[in-house]
Amino acid sequence: MGHRRILTGEQIAQLFDPPTDRRGIIRHYTLSAADLAMIRRGRGDHHRLGLALMLCYLRYPGRPLHAGEIPDPALVSFVATQIDVLPDSLGAYLRVDQNRRRHSAALQDRLGLRPWGPRVAADLADWLLGHALETDRLVDLAALVLEECRGRGILLPPPARLERLCIEVRYRARREIERRLTEGLSADQRRRLDALTERRLDTSQSWLAWLRQIPESAKPASMLGVIERLEHIRAIDIDPARGHRINQSRLAQLVREAGRTTVQHVAGYERRRRHAVLTAIDLDLSARLTDQAITLFERLIGAMFRKAEGRHARAFQAEGRAINEKVRLYARIGAALMAARAGQGDPFAAIDKVIPWDRFCSTVMEAETLVRSEDFDPYEVLSEHYAGIRRWAPAFLATFEFQGVPAAASLMRAIAMLRAMNSAGASTLPKSAPTAFVRPRWARHVLTAHGIDRRYYELCVLAELRQRLAAGDVWVTGSRQYRAFEERLISRETLQVLQKASGIPVAIETDFDRFIETRRTWLDARLAEVDARARGGLLPDVTIEKGVLRITPIEKSTPPEAEALAAKLYATLPRIRITDLLTEVAGWTGFLDCFTHLRTGEAAADPRVLMAGLLADGLNLGLTRMAEACSIASLGQLAWTADWHIRDETYALALRRLVEHQSREPLAALFGSGTASSSDGQFFRAGGSGRDASRINAHYGPEPGLKFYTHLSDRYAPFHTRVIAATASEALHVLDGLLDHHGDAPPRQHRHHTDGGGVSDHVFALCALLGYVFAPRIPDLKDRRLYSFDRPAAYPTLAPMIAGRINVDLIRAHWPDLLRIATSIRTGTVSASVILRQLAAYPRQNAVAAALRELGRLERTLFTLDWLEDPGLRRESSHELNKGEARNSLARAVFIHRLGEIRDRTFENQKHRASGLNLLVTAIILWNTRYLAQAIQALRQVEDVPGTLLRHLSPIGWEHVNLTGDYIWSANQQSTENHAGLRPLRPIPDTTIKAA
C-alpha cells in the first residue's frame, strides 16, 4: 500500500527546493575562492557549471540535483556569472546523467555528508520528540528535521520518508502528552472524569455537554449557572498545576480536538487517551468558567450603573415640564420685581399682580422638591438594585479567591468580611468594617450619620472590586484573563539576561539619559521652528491666532478624470460569481492548503466543501443555509469540515498567504509603498441570540452590536481583524494587529494611521518603544494640549496650546518598567491590548501608567508639530483612512445575509464571521488587483493611460462580483496548484481618458 501524502506539493517545494528570490540566492550561493578554484579544474564550461550547481544544491537545501531536474534560471544565471560561463551550457551537462551522479558522489565525500539511513532516522526521531511536544504541525516538524540534517551534515531524505518520520514522532509525542496528563490520577479522580460522559439525571444531556454550554447573557441566572458548573468541575479535584506538565498550546489543541468530537466518541477512547482528554477539558473549563464569571460580574455591575443613570435621567426628564413652568413663572416674577424697583413700587404688590401670595409660597415649596444636587448623583438610586445584586453576589464572593496589591488590602479585608457574614447569615456590619477603600463619591452614601449603610457598603465593595480587577490591582486565582499584572510580564531575570546577551528588542536607545537628551534637543528645536513659522504665518493651511488653532480641511484630491478611468477599467473586468472568484484565487495562491485538519494536518479532501464553509462565514449565511444554497455538500459534511479545518490559526495562515500575494502584485506598488497602514473599527448590529452577548454603544444608536477592528496595508491588503465590544476603546487594539503581522521585525519607520478612536498617549508611547511611527488623525486637535521641556513662555505663539512641562523625573524613575513592558509585548509574553487595558484602568496616581502617559505626551507633541507643519502628512493620513472606509464599504456589501447582523451567541463563532469576511474581502482585492493590471494593459493598447491617474485607482470595487444566489461549483472549477490562466476581459467602453 502506497504512502498517503499529507504535505502538499507547495509545502514540499518550500522544504526541498532552492530559494528563487534574489536575496536568498545571494545568501546561499555566493561561492568562495576555494570553491571557484575547485570548479575551474572541471573539463569544459558545462562540467564546471554542473559541478557548481551540484555544490550549491548539496549545501542548500542539502540534497543533490535530481535526474531530470532543471534549476531555476535565476540561480543558474547567478552561479554562471561567478564562474564566467554561459548559462546555456547547462543543457549539455543535464543530458549526461553519469556526470551528475559522479559529481554528486565526489562532492558528498568532499563536504563530509552522510546518507540518510535507519540509524540516522532513529537519532533524529529522538531529537525531534522534544520539539513535537511543543508543536503538532507536520510542516513545522519537517522543517526542523531538515534544518537539523543540514547542521549535522546529513543528506535530506526523500519527502515520503520525512513525512513518515514526522508522523511517527508526532504519535509518540501525543502518547507522551497523554502520559504526563494522567500520571498520578487517583481512582476516584478517574471515576469522576468518566462520569462527565454520562447522562445527567432525568435528562438526555451528558454532564460534559452541559458544562460546555456556558451562559453568556448578563443576567443573575447566568452568573449562578456559571458558578454551578464551576463547582461541578472543582469537585473532580484536578490540580491546575497538572496542566503545566505540557506545552500550553498542545493542551489547547487537545481541548479543541475534543470540542469537535461528540461526547460518545470521547467516551469510546482507550483509557489513557480518554482520561488525558477529559483532564485537559477539566482544566480548560475551570479557567474559562472563572473568566466568564468575572466577565459577567463586570457586566452586571456595569448594567447596575447604567440603569441607575438611565432612571435618574428619565426622572429628570419627567419633571422637566414642571421645572419649565417654574422657570417661566419666576422669570415673570423677576421682571415684575425689576419693574417695581425701577418705579419705586411695592415689591409684594408686584408679586401679587403675577400670582397670589399663598400660591407663590406653594410654588416655592414645590420647587424645593424638584431641586437636585448640583452633580445629579445617580448613586442615590443604586440601593434600589441591591435586591437584584444579592441574588448572585454572595455566591460569587464565596466561589472565587481574590488577591491584590498592598494598596487593595482594605478591599480584600472587606471582601473576606462580607464572605464571612454571608456564610453566617449576619445582617449587621461590625463597627470595625474596613472603609479605607471607599472613594469620596461613595462616602456620603456609605458612611452616614447613623453608621455604615449595609446596602451601599456592599455595592461599594463590588464596584471597587470591578474597578480593581480591570486595573490589575486585584486578580483571581485560576483565571487566565484576570491575572496579576506582574505575571503577565517577562520576568526581571529574563530581561537582564536579554540585556546582557543581544539587547532587549525595543526600537529606541535604552540608556535613559542618552534617550531623553536626544528627545529634549529634538523637541526644543521643533517647538522653536514651528513657533517661528506660526508667528510668521508660514504654516500651510494652519493659523494660530490668540491661542486658537485652525486647520483648513483637506479637500478631495481625486480628479474626475481618475474616477472616469476607474469606471472604465472596472467596466472591462469579467463578471464572476464569488464561488468562481474564490476558486481562481485558490489556484493562484494555494491558500486552501492552510486549512489543515486539526489532528492529522491534512488538507481538506474536497476544496469545494471547504470553500462553502468559508463562504458561509464570510457572507454571513451560516452553514444551514449554505447547505441549502449549494449542491456539493450536506449540512453534516459542511459542519464536519468547518469543525476540523476552519479555525482561528488556519484563517490567519490563509489570510497571510493572500496578503503576501496581493502585496507582490506589480499593480499593488501603485497603491502604496508598503511602509504604511491604517486601522478602523466597523460596527455590526447584533440580532437573534447574538443580542445577549453584545453591547449598546450610543454612538451607533440604541441597538446592541459589536465591532470588527481591521488593519489595512497601504496596498489595500486587510492583514488583521479582531472582534471587539461595541463599547471597547479601539486604541487598545492598534498595536496587536501590527505586531501579529510584522512579527519580530517591524519595517523601519512603518507609519500607522487611525482616526480618533485609536488615539491615546499610551499608544503613542508604546509605538515609539516598539519602532512604529504613530500618525493618527486626532479629532479636536485645537483642544489637545502640547508639552515641552522648557517654559511655555519660550514659545509665545504656541504657549496657549502648551499645558505644561514633561515630567522627566517620573519617566526616569520608571524607565526600567517601561522597557520591560515593551519587551514583554515584543516577545509575545503578553498582548499589547491586555497591557493597555490594564494601564488605562489604573487610577491616575499609578506611577507606571502615569510615566507611560508622560512619554506618550512627549511623542504626541512631536507628532503634532509635524502635523501642523506638513500638509503632506495630513493628506497621507486622510488618504490612508479613506482606504479603510472604502474597504469597510466592500465588507458591508459582502456581509450581505441575515440583514448584515451578527446572530452568533459565542465569541468563537463571531470571530469566525469576522475572519471569514476578511478573507473574502482580501480574495476580492487580490482578484481585482490582478485583473485591473490586465485591464490597464489592454486599455493602453488603444489609448493613452496617464500614470498620474493610476495613483488614484483602488482594488475595492465589487459590482462585477455576484455575491448572492445559488453557490455552485463544478468539478472542472476546482482549484489546482500553479493555475495561471485569466478570464477574458469585457469590451472596453468607447470613451477617452484625458490627463488631469
Question: Where does each model-flagged region fall?
Answer:
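Short, conserved catalytic/metal-binding motifs centered on acidic residues
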Residues: 62, 623-627, 677-683, 752-757
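Long amphipathic alpha-helical coiled-coil/heptad-repeat bundle
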Residues: 2-520
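Electropositive nucleic-acid engagement tracts
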Residues: 601-602, 618-676
